[in-house]
Each structure stands twice: as C-alpha cells, then as structure tokens.
C-alpha cells in the first residue's frame, strides 16, 4: 500500500510546491498580471528556492543516513523559515496605517550595487512603499498573506518530515 507520508513522498511534495509557487509567481503574477516583485517578494522567492533545492536533493538521492537527512531537513527548513519570516514582515508592512508606511526607495538592484550585504538586508526589512501596497487579492488575501499561509503549511510538512526521520523504525510483522 502506498504511504503518502513517507520521507521521499514528503520531499517530492516540497519540490512540487516549490515548482507551483515559483511558476505562479513568475508566469501568472509577473508575466500575465504584469507585477514586478518588490524586494521582500524576491527574498521570499529565494527562501522558497532554497527549500526546494534541499528537498530536491533529498528526493533524488533519498539518503539513508539520519545525519544526512537531518542536514538536508535543516537546510530546507532554514529556507522556508526565512521565507515565512520575510512574508510575516511583508504582511505587517501591508497592515500599517497609511501615515506609517515607509517611503519608496531605490530598487533592490541599486542597493546590491552600492551597499554592503548587511546594509541591503537592513534596507529590505525596513520596507518601502512598494512593499506596503496591495496590488491583487484572492479570497480577500493579499499575495504576502497567501504566501505566509503556504509557508506555514510547508513548515508543518517539515515537522512531519522530522518525525519521519527520527521516529524509531517499527518492526515489520513476521510472515506466516
């Protein structure tokens, strides 16, 4: 009988969710709707890609070593955790009163060209006016709110994967 919650199937689920999320962002929101991603959106995508990369390695190579599985899990969790934190900050910026919204600044490309990485991170998390605007909603949720829900589901999936990694192996019943 096929178990949907096996280690490999859960990793494949993460890879599929990464592909769907990135495809939705790139093809629908950017190409079809014409939205340019703000710096916080770009950082969320980076986190999703990191998670997807580690999950892809785990799904393809299906390591037997618990240490390797835990390292891949930790890398994947770090990626999606990063994305969730950034999405949470993004949602917070969108719910600020209008008089507290930061002003628009130069784009991420300019910051990367002129500032050290530590300062770039500070500027991105400070937010800008473009990060606080709500351009599109679905079911009453903005894009960052939808992303935060997806990232929360993926974090719960990571907890299930951790359980699959560390749970003691159950002995198989003896054949009669």
Curated annotation (Swiss-Prot):
Cystine pairings recorded for this chain: 38-41, 104-131
Compartments in which it is found: Cell inner membrane
Topological domain ranges for the Periplasmic compartment: 29-46, 89-145
Keywords: Cell inner membrane, Cell membrane, Chaperone, Disulfide bond, Electron transport, Membrane, Oxidoreductase, Redox-active center, Transmembrane, Transmembrane helix, Transport
Membrane spanning stretches: 12-28, 47-63, 71-88, 146-164
GO terms, molecular function: electron transfer activity; protein-disulfide reductase activity
GO biological process: protein folding
Membrane topology: Multi-pass membrane protein
Pfam families per the UniProt record, alphabetical: DsbB
Major subcellular location class: membrane
InterPro entries membership: DiS_bond_form_DsbB/BdbC, Disulphide_bond_form_DsbB, DsbB, DsbB-like_sf
Gene Ontology cellular component annotations, sorted alphabetically: plasma membrane
Cytoplasmic face of the membrane: 1-11, 64-70, 165-176
Entry-linked HAMAP family: DsbB
Family: Belongs to the DsbB family.
Function: Required for disulfide bond formation in some periplasmic proteins. Acts by oxidizing the DsbA protein.
Protein name: Disulfide bond formation protein B
Gene source species: Psychrobacter cryohalolentis (strain ATCC BAA-1226 / DSM 17306 / VKM B-2378 / K5)
GN (gene name): dsbB
């Amino acid at each position: 009988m096929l178990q949907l919650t096996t280690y490999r199937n859960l990793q494949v689920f993460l890879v599929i969710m990464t592909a769907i999320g990135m495809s939705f962002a790139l093809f629908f929101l950017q190409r079809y709707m014409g939205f340019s991603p703000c710096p916080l959106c770009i950082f969320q995508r980076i986190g999703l890609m990191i998670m997807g990369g580690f999950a892809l390695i785990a799904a393809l190579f299906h390591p037997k070593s618990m240490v390797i599985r835990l390292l891949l899990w930790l890398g994947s969790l770090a990626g999606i955790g990063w994305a969730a934190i950034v999405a949470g900050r993004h949602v917070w910026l969108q719910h600020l009163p209008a008089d507290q919204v930061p002003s628009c600044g130069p784009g991420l490309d300019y910051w990367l060209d002129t500032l050290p990485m530590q300062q770039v991170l500070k500027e991105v998390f400070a937010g800008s006016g473009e990060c606080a605007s709500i351009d599109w909603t679905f079911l009453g949720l903005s894009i960052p709110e939808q992303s935060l829900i997806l990232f929360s589901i993926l974090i719960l999936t990571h907890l299930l994967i951790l359980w699959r990694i560390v749970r003691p192996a159950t002995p198989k019943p003896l054949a009669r």
